[in-house]
Amino acid sequence: IAVVHAPGSNSDSVAEHAMMLILGAIKNVVVVDRLTRKSDWSEARWRGNFEVKGKTLGIIGVGNIGRRVARMAAAFGMRVIGYDPYLPAAELTARGAEPMPSLAALLGQADVITCHTPHTPGTHHMIDAAAVGRMKDGVVFVNTSRGKVQDEAALLAGLKSGKIARAGLDVFEEEPISSDSELLHQDNVIVTSHLAGVTGESMRAMALQVTGEMLRLLRGERPHVVANPDVHVTLTHLVPATR
């Protein structure tokens, strides 16, 4: 049985959400909103708001989503650097990111770090205590990829110490995140419920993409994207897709 899927159908939605978390964290939106509602006007105006322009954004994983974030960040006047072990330097440059030779190099230069990488044995707890230690003081950290890429104990320690000034998290090691998680009680963390890719537009695009693959099979054509490559040998009788 061929299993088809819809890669890239929610890339714009996730990239926009990542950029929203970046801006929200830099502008300290959640804290300022809370203080303004309490009529603490003066305090709200001096809660560490700073500019995006001129800051260095480090993108970990410059795929479908990362390249879109790079384009958005450049429009805000950010310097964009990227690390992706699966892409050559020339391709990273073409995708709008200055290539970094290693994760450590990126961590040491970025004012803002955003993760766009799958969870694999190689990326499990990639953002651990050692990685946090390599970051610049006062960094902003954003993750809209997979929760287990981050070691939340190390992340929490960094947030409490001020090493990580602010964070925007759409994903967590365990989901739903427990209501007693300390991350939920940090003023310098914006949290959302793994919804970056869930928009009306992305759901429609996903449905249309999968339906198109099903129709190709019914027409006797090979689908464009098959999730289980072991069935490819059983699809050789199908003709290449015409559309």
Summary of predicted features, one role per range:
Residues D170, H194, G220:
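Active-site glycine-centered loops adjacent to acidic/histidine catalytic or metal-binding residues
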Residues S202-R243:
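NAD(P)-dependent dehydrogenase/reductase Rossmann-like domain
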Residues P85-E182:
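Rossmann-like adenosine-cofactor binding region
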